[in-house]
Amino acid sequence: MSVDLATVKRVARLARIAVSEEEAQNMLGQLNGILGFVEQLSEVNVDGVEPMTSVTPVEMKKRADVVTDGNKADDIVANAPATDRDFFMVPKVVE
């Protein structure tokens, strides 16, 4: 697969990128190089190869998924002018 100059200009216009003729020519070479590399990757036989997310198998450390109150109630209300237990007290605004 390769890209021509008209396609480069069209994509630049769709992306709302202003490119000069010289920049478009430069991008044409770069995009064709990238597409050539992708074509090489598609030629690699990967039958029987398991998908992986890391070069070495790594088991992620996970914390227990336990619901807690965060144990921060005292810290949260510490600077409030008025509190009742772990709740903020505010002046009545609706009659």
From Swiss-Prot:
GO biological process: glutaminyl-tRNAGln biosynthesis via transamidation; regulation of translational fidelity; translation
Keyword Transferase (UniProt): no
Documented EC number(s): 6.3.5.-
Pfam families for the chain: GatC (PF02686)
Keywords: ATP-binding, Ligase, Nucleotide-binding, Protein biosynthesis
UniProt catalytic activity: L-glutamyl-tRNA(Gln) + L-glutamine + ATP + H2O = L-glutaminyl-tRNA(Gln) + L-glutamate + ADP + phosphate + H(+); L-aspartyl-tRNA(Asn) + L-glutamine + ATP + H2O = L-asparaginyl-tRNA(Asn) + L-glutamate + ADP + phosphate + 2 H(+)
Gene3D superfamilies registered for this protein in UniProt: Glu-tRNAGln amidotransferase C subunit, N-terminal domain (1.10.20.60)
Stored InterPro entries: Asp/Glu-ADT_sf_sub_c (IPR036113), GatC (IPR003837)
MF (Gene Ontology): asparaginyl-tRNA synthase (glutamine-hydrolyzing) activity; ATP binding; glutaminyl-tRNA synthase (glutamine-hydrolyzing) activity
UniProt keyword annotation of Protein biosynthesis present: yes
Top enzyme class: ligase
Origin superkingdom: Bacteria
Assembly mode: Heterotrimer of A, B and C subunits.
Family of this protein: Belongs to the GatC family.
HAMAP family, alphabetized: GatC (MF_00122)
Protein role: Allows the formation of correctly charged Asn-tRNA(Asn) or Gln-tRNA(Gln) through the transamidation of misacylated Asp-tRNA(Asn) or Glu-tRNA(Gln) in organisms which lack either or both of asparaginyl-tRNA or glutaminyl-tRNA synthetases. The reaction takes place in the presence of glutamine and ATP through an activated phospho-Asp-tRNA(Asn) or phospho-Glu-tRNA(Gln).
Classification via NCBIfam families: gatC
Name of the protein this chain belongs to: Aspartyl/glutamyl-tRNA(Asn/Gln) amidotransferase subunit C
Native source species: Agrobacterium fabrum (strain C58 / ATCC 33970) (Agrobacterium tumefaciens (strain C58))
Lineage: Bacteria, Pseudomonadati, Pseudomonadota, Alphaproteobacteria, Hyphomicrobiales
Gene designation per UniProt: gatC
